A protein has these predicted regions:
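An anion/phosphate-binding loop that grips the pyrophosphate of nucleotide cofactors and donors
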Residues: 161-162
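N-terminal topogenic membrane-targeting module
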Residues: 34-130, 134, 138
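Short beta-alpha junction loops
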Residues: 62-63, 90-97, 171, 189, ...
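Structural alpha-helical scaffold elements that stabilize or flank donor/cofactor-binding regions
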Residues: 157-158
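Hydrophobic alpha-helical transmembrane segments
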Residues: 2-32
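C-terminal interaction surface of TIR/SEFIR-family domains
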Residues: 205-242
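IQ-motif-like calmodulin-binding regions
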Residues: 145
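Conserved TIR/SEFIR loop-to-helix hotspot centered on a Trp-containing motif
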Residues: 171-185, 189
Length: 242
């Protein structure tokens, strides 16, 4: 979209410049814009890897907005070039994941219909996830909107269809019951699953270790990430791509 906007502005300036001399014929300067969507579709097809793209599930300690947003900007955006991202919606990443479809749905009053109201809603909601590449070659971030009574069922379903999990436990403490449940669910998953866990000096590793004591050996890979620097970003991406 940004690429198209830049070219649109440049061509519009040229069209307006020559319009005084040739009149409406100056609009011909805008014709190259017709080729941009086609070219981007061809580019996306050429980049498409064979087989099913991997799915990344992102979990985190809520109310750690600044750290989670930094992680999203530096890591998740890079992952989107290779595979899908799914997460349980929260206000901490609203400005990172909001797209035009979300805005129009909200304005039309249809946002409530996206919420998972019962366990029976989980399968249809996951079946409706958009897992295709966009025209710019990136995969989308799909969110599941849940109530307090349904997020656990949604989590179990998301774990069942994810290939790798990124769990940001920076600042995690024993009283974070939701994170403890997530850790237990990941540890109990019957399918092959890689879990990359981020921690820092405030992470209660003992409480986390207790929650995953029954996990298969090697399932969890811990990374000490005290800040969102370039070296830390490379380490996280290397762990995700395995």
């Amino acid at each position: 979209m940004l690429f198209t906007a830049v070219w649109a502005i440049a061509l519009l300036v040229q069209a307006l410049t020559i319009a005084s001399a040739v009149g409406t014929a100056g609009a011909a300067m805008l014709l190259p814009l017709l080729w941009i969507p086609l070219a981007m579709q061809v580019y996306a097809r050429l980049k498409r890897a064979p087989g099913r793209p991997p799915t990344l599930l992102v979990l985190r300690v809520f109310q750690r907005d600044a750290q989670v947003q930094g992680l999203f900007d530096q890591v998740i955006e890079r992952w989107r070039l290779s595979g899908n991202t799914v997460l349980i919606a929260g206000t901490d990443l609203a400005d990172r994941t909001l797209d035009a479809d979300d805005i129009f749905t909200f304005l039309d009053g249809g946002l409530a219909a996206r919420f998972i109201r019962s366990a029976a809603d989980v399968a249809p909601r996951l079946a409706a996830l958009d897992l295709e590449r966009d025209a710019d070659g990136r995969f989308r971030v799909n969110e599941c909107y849940c109530h307090d009574t349904t997020w656990q069922a949604a989590l179990q379903a998301l774990v069942g269809r994810s290939d790798v999990v990124l769990m940001d436990l920076r600042g995690f403490q024993a009283h974070n019951a939701g994170c403890r449940y997530e850790l237990g669910t990941l540890a109990s998953a019957s399918r092959a699953l890689r879990v990359v866990v981020l921690s820092d000096g405030q992470t209660d590793r003992a409480a986390a270790a207790q929650a995953i004591a029954h996990a298969a050996p090697g399932r969890f890979e811990w990374l000490d990430i005290a800040r969102n620097g370039a070296r830390e970003r490379r380490a996280v991406l290397a762990a995700l791509f395995g």
